UniProtKB/Swiss-Prot annotation:
The keyword DNA-binding does not apply. This is 3-hydroxyacyl-[acyl-carrier-protein] dehydratase FabZ. It is an enzyme of class 4 (lyase). The gene is fabZ. The keyword Transmembrane helix does not apply. InterPro entries: FabA_FabZ, FabZ, HotDog_dom_sf. SUPFAM superfamilies: Thioesterase/thiol ester dehydrase-isomerase (SSF54637). Belongs to the thioester dehydratase family. FabZ subfamily. Involved in unsaturated fatty acids biosynthesis. Catalyzes the dehydration of short chain beta-hydroxyacyl-ACPs and long chain saturated and unsaturated beta-hydroxyacyl-ACPs. One of its GO terms (biological process) is fatty acid biosynthetic process.
Length: 144
C-alpha cells in the first residue's frame, strides 16, 4: 500500500489536481488499484453543480490516469519521468459520483511498448461501475 506521501514521491500532481488518496496495490509496470475519497469539500463542486454536486467525468478519468501513472512510474527505470495522458478510447460513464462516495480506481496495463503504454481502467463505487475506459500513456522527461 502507498500513502499520499509515497504517491507524491512518484507522480508530480498536487492539490487541487491530485486525485488519488492511496494506492492499495501496485505491480510495477503492470497494474494498480487506488482510492479517491470524494468529499463535499472538493474544489470542483463549487461549479459542478452547486445545487447538485457531481464529480466531472473527466476528473474520474484523470484519477484513473494518475493510478496508471503510479503503476508505470513505480518501475525503477521510469522513476523521475512523467507519464503523459496520450489517449482515451471507449470511455463510458455509468453512474454519478457524488460527495461521500469512495472511488475504487483499477488500471491494468494491456500493452507496453517502449515509452507508450495502454491500459484498461475501471472506476467503481460500492462495486458499481462508474466509468470504464482504455487509456494510453506516453512516458517522457521534463524539459527545462
Amino acid at each position: 500500500m502507498l500513502d499520499i506521501q509515497q504517491i507524491k514521491e512518484i507522480i508530480p500532481h498536487r492539490y487541487p489536481f491530485l486525485l488519488v488518496d492511496k494506492v492499495l496495490e501496485v505491480e510495477e509496470g503492470k497494474r494498480a488499484i487506488g482510492i479517491k475519497n470524494v468529499t463535499a469539500n472538493e474544489e470542483f463542486f463549487n461549479g459542478h453543480f452547486p445545487d447538485y454536486p457531481v464529480m466531472p467525468g473527466v476528473l474520474i478519468v484523470e484519477a484513473l490516469a494518475q493510478v496508471g501513472a503510479v503503476a508505470m512510474l513505480k518501475k525503477e527505470e521510469n522513476r523521475g519521468r512523467l507519464a503523459f495522458f496520450a489517449g482515451i478510447d471507449n470511455c463510458r460513464f455509468k453512474r454519478q459520483v457524488r460527495p461521500g462516495d469512495q472511488l475504487r480506481l483499477e488500471v491494468e496495463m494491456t500493452r507496453v511498448r517502449g515509452a507508450i503504454g495502454k491500459g484498461k481502467a475501471i472506476a467503481t463505487v460500492d462495486g458499481e461501475i462508474a466509468c470504464e475506459t482504455e487509456i494510453t500513456f506516453a512516458l517522457g522527461d521534463k524539459k527545462e
